[in-house]
């Protein structure tokens, strides 16, 4: 099962966050990082990162920029907005070329071993349908915005239609922040 989280890394005193789908297995985590992302670049050489379990809206925010209220555990950044954060040491890196419906891409598969975790005192909010749609928009946005991923024109059109459809629903069921985040993604992709 793929779990959507926010990964936080640090390189040269600069913090980075990104929404990533990860696989949890016992005390390990496995994630696939696309070439060209800051997280890929950071974890090419850095050995520590955090996995942040956050509200869905924070996953969508993470696709747009690295600004956040960071806390630190042994110089590993994690998000103040997390329900909890798990800290990992990279134990394996594998590089593969992938060709799927999203196009051709270079992946780095990271395996991390858990070294610690912290639970924050953040209270969950009720789930809104716009939360899930924003996460789906963020996944599509991250693929369309990454210039290193070559996407077939038909798939690109389908993804563009999906992101517009999700936005139309968010406008009906989401709050102000949901709508603003969705509009920013569409604007950045020149779809609005």
What are these regions (language model features)?
Residues 129, 135-179:
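Eukaryotic intrinsically disordered, low-complexity regulatory regions
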Residues 93-151:
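Flexible glycine-rich active-site/ligand-binding loops centered on an Asp-His dyad
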Residues 174-192:
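C-terminal non-catalytic accessory extensions
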Residues 1-48, 52-59:
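N-terminal structural module
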Residues 28-30, 48, 83-85, 107-109:
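Intrinsic-disorder/low-complexity, polar/charged segments enriched in Ser/Thr/Lys/Arg/Asp/Glu/Gln
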Residues 46-97:
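Ordered, amphipathic secondary-structure segments that act as subunit-interaction surfaces
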Residues 76-80, 96-102, 168-173, 177:
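Exposed beta-sheet edge/beta-hairpin loop segments within beta-rich domains
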Residues 5, 18, 86-88, 108-110:
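Hydrophobic residues positioned within well-ordered beta-strands of beta-sheet architectures
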């Amino acid at each position: 099962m793929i779990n959507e989280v926010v990964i936080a890394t640090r390189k040269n005193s600069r913090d980075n966050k990104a929404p990533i789908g990860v696989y949890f297995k016992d005390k390990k985590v496995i994630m696939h990082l696309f070439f060209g992302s800051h997280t890929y670049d950071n974890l090419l050489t850095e050995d520590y990162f955090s996995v942040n379990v956050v509200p869905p809206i924070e996953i969508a925010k993470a696709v747009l920029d690295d600004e956040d209220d960071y806390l630190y555990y042994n110089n590993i950044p994690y998000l103040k907005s997390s329900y909890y954060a798990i800290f990992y040491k990279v134990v394996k890196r594998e590089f593969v070329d992938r060709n799927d419906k999203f196009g051709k891409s270079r992946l780095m598969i990271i395996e991390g071993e858990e070294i610690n975790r912290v639970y924050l005192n953040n209270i969950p909010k009720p789930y809104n349908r716009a939360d899930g749609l924003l996460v789906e928009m963020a996944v599509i946005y991250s693929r369309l915005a990454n210039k290193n991923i070559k996407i077939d024109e038909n798939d690109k059109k389908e993804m563009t239609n999906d992101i517009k459809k999700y936005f139309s629903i968010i406008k009906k069921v989401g709050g102000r922040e949901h709508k603003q985040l969705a509009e920013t993604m569409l604007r950045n992709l020149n779809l609005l």
